[in-house]
Amino acid sequence: MIKYGTSGFRTHHSVILDISEKIGLALAQLVYYKKESFGIMITASHNHHEDNGVKIMDENGNMVTEDIERYLVQYVNDQFTNDNMPYEPLIKIFNEDIQIIKNKNLKLHIGYDSRQSSPDICEKIIKGILRTNDQFPYIVHPLVTTPELHFIF
């Protein structure tokens, strides 16, 4: 089981790569249900070079709430049952709902640093986002630091 640490998930890059598509799916669904933008920063700053991670931030650039942390942990670890799922499970977001998201200027911001595994993790996150709808709005900010993504976002 992968655990949520300070602001996100960090471990060996291969584990992060394995859960990246689920992270994209989960965050796209959060944008849909919460009607707010989120940021995803791919970095493991001070960790070993083989590690990587994803930091999740709310639309104000702050750490997400504990209920969202729990949701993300349960989502990436496949721990949902009908009794504990906080949102209606979905994979597809309808075009009408995408238009509402776009009209409210909501999107996912994805930033990543210079770690070798970061672009591959980003691509898998995007794959998860686009599984919900191929028109889901997102922006990639390559080669940024975490503070830069906070500022952009």
Model-derived segments and spans:
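Non-catalytic beta/alpha edge segments that cap or flank active sites
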Residues: 1-153
